[in-house]
């Protein structure tokens, strides 16, 4: 696989573009682990983002009913069309965060790390069965961080409100070419059956001051909700979980706060 990559890079005169986060996966075992974790079968319609030179795409095409792969680099698309004769792969050119996604039931992808956050938030709002995605390790650790921990963030809260998230394996820098500056992780995401849909503006407002207590965080960022401090003065100290700091809140507790603010006409 490594030799094949270098052959193709040389054949087509490709220099990986760091500006769009091009790091090509060169370890077959990681590809196999991703496909195994996703439990890919002949009935699946797969979404992939950033196919690179097609190594993961090719294995998905052998096992899935259909593969949609999104690639922003026109030169890479031309190479894929020349090198492979897939009849069940559709290549979509564009920015994966901005283009409309086709219908799919699973995601298997080594995404460009620069789009990790917007890609993940978009994915969590989409109907799917299972996603297996390679992320920067630091990002993955934030996704699975527990309330009260150092890494717990808006990302942690939103990911865990909508999905069950698990780090399947850690991946060293040597699994990619060119070698990235960071370690990676393979992450499994499955939608929660009891999804907690939260007001995103409220979550953003709270996490502007993640180490402050809930009342203080709301007072200091209430303008983000289009409300003045005068409008909340009489109710803010009775907000649910007022003794907690923002980074200690579980998704269910943020929902309690949201419902309280709705009841008092602060948010709709």
Swiss-Prot record:
Keywords: Cytoplasm, Methyltransferase, RNA-binding, rRNA processing, S-adenosyl-L-methionine, Transferase. One of its GO terms (molecular function) is RNA binding. S-adenosyl-L-methionine binds at residues 23, 25, 50, 71, 95, 110. CDD domains: AdoMet_MTases (cd02440). The keyword Acyltransferase does not apply. The keyword Methyltransferase applies. Its EC number is 2.1.1.-. Belongs to the class I-like SAM-binding methyltransferase superfamily. rRNA adenine N(6)-methyltransferase family. RsmA subfamily. Specifically dimethylates two adjacent adenosines in the loop of a conserved hairpin near the 3'-end of 16S rRNA in the 30S particle. May play a critical role in biogenesis of 30S subunits. PANTHER family: DIMETHYLADENOSINE TRANSFERASE (PTHR11727), DIMETHYLADENOSINE TRANSFERASE-RELATED (PTHR11727:SF7). This is Probable ribosomal RNA small subunit methyltransferase A. It comes from Pyrococcus horikoshii (strain ATCC 700860 / DSM 12428 / JCM 9974 / NBRC 100139 / OT-3). The lineage of its organism: Archaea, Methanobacteriati, Methanobacteriota, Thermococci, Thermococcales.
